[in-house]
């Protein structure tokens, strides 16, 4: 008997239910997402892995409400902390992106304004909707006053400032000067927390003056500024060298705990998933074919596509050339019938082209969409 792998309840910050999406193009309609289902728990670092063009980034854009004009969601729901974001009005979605959802993209230079300093761009976040950030900014400064960095007792000379801030917090009101001062203090502390050297200097710099790794750290700091419920990280280490890549990944993992956010990490690299994720979903041609805890997936992959992906990863302990998956990724304008992987699957049989397999639970927190396991 088939079983949904999403779990209703208070532990899920994100729940996607039977999401179908297509793109209208001159060549025809592209069936980009074919009824995907997944859930992410509060505080979880969840990996979404698959080949290029399988629908990973489209999933993130649908969650964030950033789809291009030629995209159409034909069915399904996306719940963020119990609220269906697909039903939100444009202004409500903008506020959700400002406070509840943050997204980090592959190329930070594309999304950073080249003519504004880093500090100006970070300040824009709070200026867009200052009432959303008063509590965060004031509480940050109060913590600085009460717990000095050098470990000394609080400066008695700051007591008046503390009283004024406490009043501002109670009344939810800050003047422009106070807002700018608190924003700068908070932004610099975030730049420091993402381990940027000389954060005060970086605050005054322009994006072109920073390296690729430094720009990506700035993007993470800007995302943290919102203290989002859900952080979407789309191929954020692809353009970075291996050393910087490892630093960014461990930074993301540490900060996830610090700001108590859930993270959807999108990647084509299984090694990244193994390094930092708690659970992972494997995606193929607009379908999720397997979901499991990371250790379980690497120890006991079940779907033929998952097995093929793992077999194609180069390994230092094997002298032979890694295996490749036969065939090519299907054209999603006219995708294969039934299971979309069946034309490339070494285990395919007569049922596979006739209908789409259901996602079933085959073990604790391990789900697979394949007729080999009764789907």
Short names for language-model regions:
Residues 206-210:
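Conserved ABC ATPase signature
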Residues 119, 228-320:
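P-loop NTP-binding/switch modules centered on Walker-like glycine-rich loops
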Residues 11-12, 291-375:
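Short catalytic/signature loops enriched in Gly
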Residues 73-84, 138-139, 188:
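Conserved ABC transporter NBD signature motif
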Residues 49-50:
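The feature captures the beta-strand-to-loop junction immediately N-terminal to the Walker
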Residues 85-102, 120, 128, 180, ...:
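ABC ATPase NBD coupling module
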Residues 9-13, 22-35, 66-72, 89-92, ...:
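A short, flexible loop at the N-terminus of ABC-type nucleotide-binding domains that lies
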């Amino acid at each position: 008997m088939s079983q949904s792998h999403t779990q209703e309840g208070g532990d899920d910050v994100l729940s996607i239910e039977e999401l179908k999406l297509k793109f209208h193009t001159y060549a025809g309609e592209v069936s980009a997402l074919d009824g995907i289902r997944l859930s992410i728990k509060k505080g979880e670092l969840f990996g979404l892995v698959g080949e290029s063009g399988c629908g990973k980034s489209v999933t993130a854009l649908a969650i964030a409400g950033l789809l291009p004009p030629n995209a159409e969601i034909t069915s399904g729901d996306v719940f963020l902390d119990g609220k269906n974001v697909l039903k939100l009005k444009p202004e409500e979605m903008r506020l959700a992106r400002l406070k509840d959802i943050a997204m980090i993209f592959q190329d930070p230079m594309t999304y950073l304004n080249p003519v504004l300093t880093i500090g100006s761009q970070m300040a824009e976040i709070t200026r867009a909707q200052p009432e959303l950030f008063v509590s965060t900014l004031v509480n940050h400064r109060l913590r600085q006053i009460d717990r000095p960095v050098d470990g000394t007792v609080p400066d008695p000379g700051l007591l008046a400032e503390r009283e004024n801030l406490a009043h501002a917090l109670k009344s939810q009101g800050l003047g422009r000067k106070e807002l700018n001062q608190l924003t700068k203090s908070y932004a610099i502390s975030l730049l420091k927390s993402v381990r940027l050297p000389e954060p005060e200097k970086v605050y005054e710099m322009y994006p072109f003056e920073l390296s690729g790794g430094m720009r990506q750290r700035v993007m993470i700091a800007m995302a943290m500024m919102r203290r989002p419920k859900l952080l979407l990280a789309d191929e954020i280490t692809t353009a970075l060298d291996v050393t910087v890549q490892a630093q960014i990944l461990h930074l993301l993992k540490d900060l996830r705990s610090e700001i108590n956010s859930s993270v959807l990490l999108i990647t084509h690299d299984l090694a990244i998933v193994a390094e930092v994720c708690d659970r992972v979903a494997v995606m193929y041609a607009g379908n999720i074919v397997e979901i499991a805890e990371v250790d379980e997936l690497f120890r006991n992959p079940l779907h033929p596509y998952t097995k093929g992906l793992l077999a194609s990863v180069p390994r230092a302990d094997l002298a032979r050339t890694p295996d490749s998956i036969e065939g090519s990724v299907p054209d999603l304008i006219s995708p294969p019938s039934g299971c979309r992987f069946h034309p490339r699957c070494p285990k395919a049989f007569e049922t596979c082209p006739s209908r789409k397999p259901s996602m079933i639970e085959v073990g604790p927190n391990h789900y697979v969409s394949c007729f080999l396991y009764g789907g």
